[in-house]
Structures are given as structure tokens and as C-alpha cells.
Amino acid sequence: MPPKSLSNLSQTAGVNQSGFFPGASERDFLPATDRTTAEFVIRCVIPSLYLLIITVGLLGNIVLVKIFLTNSAMRSVPNIFISNLAAGDVLLLLTCVPVDASRYFLDEWMFGKVGCKLIPVIQLTSVGVSVFTLTALSADRYRAIVNPMDIQTSGAVLWTCVKAGGIWVVSVLLAVPEAVFSEVARIDGLDNGSFTACIPYPQTDELHPKIHSVLIFLVYFLIPLGIISVYYYHIAKTLIKSAHNLPGEYNEHTKKQMETRKRLAKIVLVFVGCFVFCWFPNHILYMYRSFNYNEIDPSLGHMIVTLVARVLSFCNSCVNPFALYLLSESFRKHFNNQLCCGRKSYRERSPSYLLSSSAVRMTSLKSNAKNIVTNSVVPNGHSVKQEMAL
């Protein structure tokens, strides 16, 4: 097999988002002495991990979206963005993960030219939705903490829905070039055989993978992470400053408000950390392979690194519900309630709020909801009006 083709086929199904190669597996490029171990890993361990990722990811994300849709008190700005994250993850879990899993059992690309064009677009769209939504979430936390007078209104929720839709549109548009360049090609194997595979760019083009890997790293990782870092720098600076400049008579109330805001910022930061941890290995591995286009490492160790990077990238689609479950007591109670059939809706039985950008929403045990207006104090000491549903 020519080195170029080998490089294409062995690249990870990660950051280039076109690297789904069910027709070719890293085991095809291993020395014969390593293939027994590789076969065990590929036939037993990897499919089990994929099945676990799909099952856990779908359960967590679908329940998360259901909780937000069925509890009106939770339809806040940050929750809309979190639901957007979950929707993108569900799309990835239902399409890309099963297709990638098939590569360990099929010797040919079985999804045709349409699948070769569509699957890379879906994966890149999902990653775009994730990273751009995390950036929007960080911007929302920045406004909520640095500009505390900007209180959430019903119009803000509608505008956030528009932003979420815009994120999907932008993500799809940025992913369209994947469909343009991806193609099904016939590849010569090591054992004088050949197979069909979906490759992300023409086999003879050595410049394309370098440009592609750098652009993907910048647009889907480095630039958003830089923006998020700037937001959190200002968030941290504001929280530290406000902690030393609170009026004494409002200290107790404002302290609770500050704790709530810090908790919300912490949740978003955990989401960002999970994304970085899961996707960074794929970015590095893809750029390494793109800039060493004419070389290939057929060792078992290299195959394991590739598989770990691939599995990590898909794990990002199921970790957010777990993070929310651990960090939010209210979500944890709602989630447990959803899993217990036959019980009354949790929103009818207990006070609840999950993530609210500024207004505090409560539900009553014994009476219908009614609105009252109260005065509250924000971290800069100003008194503002805040609506509570009791």
C-alpha cells in the first residue's frame, strides 16, 4: 500500500471529522505478530466501549432534554444552551458512533457515496454545536456576573432560542466542505488485496491535510478556547472584586446570590474542561499525521493510542449529563424522578431550580403559582427588582 493511502486510512476518527473509515482498520496495518492482540482488542474491548458510550450517552442526554422541556421553571438561558449541547450529542451518538463501530467488523465501506459525504458533515456539525454552544454559555455567565443589572426576561429566553438555532446553522455551513472533498476510494492493502474506504480528501493531495488539520484545530478548538478563557478571566476578576466590596447590611443575601452564580459558572467550566480533555488528543494526533503524511507507524502502541483518542472523542457526547448530575442537586433529583416510573412529576412535589441566569424560580407544594415582585441586591450593591414565581 502506498504510504499516502496508509496515512489516510490510519488517521483517527476524530478531529478531522471525516476520519470514519469502516472499510479499513488499524489492524490491517499491524505486523502479523501483533495481530492476535489487536484482534482481541478490536473484537471485544472496543465494541463493548462503543455500546456503553451509545447507551449511557443517549440515556443521559435524552433525559436531560426531557427535564428541561417538561419543567417550565427550568427554561432559562443557560438551560437552553445546555439542551442544545445535548441535542448535538444525541445526533452524534445516533449516527457517527454506530458507523464508526462498524469499521471493526466490515472490510468494505458499506454506506455508499451518500454516506461518505453525509457522515463527516454530521460529525463536524456536532462538534461545532458543542464548542460554539460552550462559548455562548461562557458569554452568558460573563454577562450574568459582570453585568448583574441585566436581568433575564421572557424576551431573553426567546432570543437565546434564536442564538441556539444560529449555532446549528453556522455549524452546518462550516461542515459543508467535508461533503465536497470526501470520497469513496479503492485502496490497495498490505496482503495484495484491496478494499473500499471513505477518505476525507484526494489521496494525491499532500497540502490539503495540513491546511485542513490546522484550520480544524483553530476554528474548533484553539480560538473558542481562547475566547472562553478571556470570559472566565473577567468572571474570576469580578467575583474576587465583588467579594471585597459588598455592603454589610446586604451581605447574607448577596453571599447566597454570589454562591449561585459561582456554581453556575463552575458547571460551565466543567463542561469546557471535559471538551478539552476529550478532544485535545484527537487534534494533536490528526495534526501529527497530517504533517507526517508520507510516514506511518504500524506498531501496536500506535494503534492503541489511535483507538484511545477515538473513544475519548465520543465519550465527550455522554459526559455532560454526568457532570450536571454531580454538580446540581436539583437536576439530580429530577433525573432520579424520571427514572422512577409511576411517581408524580417532581415539579409538582418540590421546589426546584436548576440553572437560572438571574431570576429565581420556585414552585409551591400546595398552591398555584402566582407572581410577586421583590427587591434584591446584586453584587455591586444596587437594588433591583426580581420576579419570583411562588
UniProtKB/Swiss-Prot annotation:
Q: What residues bear Phosphoserine in this entry?
A: S352
Q: Does the keyword Transferase apply?
A: no
Any Gene Ontology CC annotation: plasma membrane
Stretches assigned to the Cytoplasmic side: 66-76, 139-155, 232-266, 329-390
- Disulfide pairs here are C116-C198
Quote the residue positions with lipidation, kind S-palmitoyl cysteine: C341
Q: What is its main location?
A: membrane
Q: Which InterPro entries match?
A: Bombsn_rcpt-like, GPCR_Rhodpsn, GPCR_Rhodpsn_7TM, NeuroB_rcpt
Q: What is this protein called?
A: Neuromedin-B receptor
Tell me which species this is from. Sus scrofa
